[in-house]
């Protein structure tokens, strides 16, 4: 997966890895205003779980991809194609990623509002 993506994204540590690797989207953010969060939220529109965002902290705009050892080659190839599509979208239509996800029940929440005013319990409707 890392080898398929390194022609598109900057790999933070281009070394042999076991199953996880880190991408840095610093250049993508600087040149196209697309952040690691934008790409992660875009994953949701393609039905894949987003990678870990902003970790490790020493990598700017980090995305940590950690496919499990049980993933098939086909599913890894499909994930690579999705990340390549997201990269191309970042170059050609960054606003689409700024609004992602659009195909989910809950679209992009206001992260600052959610952090400042968390709702920690669900309020059931009265019957």
What are these regions (language model features)?
Residues 1-127:
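Non-catalytic terminal extensions of PLP-dependent enzymes
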């Amino acid at each position: 997966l890392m080898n398929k993506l390194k022609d598109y994204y900057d790999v933070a540590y281009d070394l042999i890895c076991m199953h996880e690797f880190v991408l840095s989207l610093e250049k993508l953010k600087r040149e196209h205003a697309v952040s690691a969060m934008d790409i992660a939220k875009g994953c949701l529109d393609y039905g894949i779980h987003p990678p870990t965002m902003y970790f490790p902290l020493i990598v700017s705009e980090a995305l940590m991809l950690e496919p499990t050892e049980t993933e098939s080659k086909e599913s890894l190839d499909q994930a690579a194609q999705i990340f390549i599509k997201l990269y191309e979208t970042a170059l050609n239509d960054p606003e689409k990623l700024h609004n992602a996800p659009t195909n989910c029940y809950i679209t992009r929440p206001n992260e600052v509002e959610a952090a400042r005013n968390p709702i920690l319990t669900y309020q059931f409707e009265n019957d």
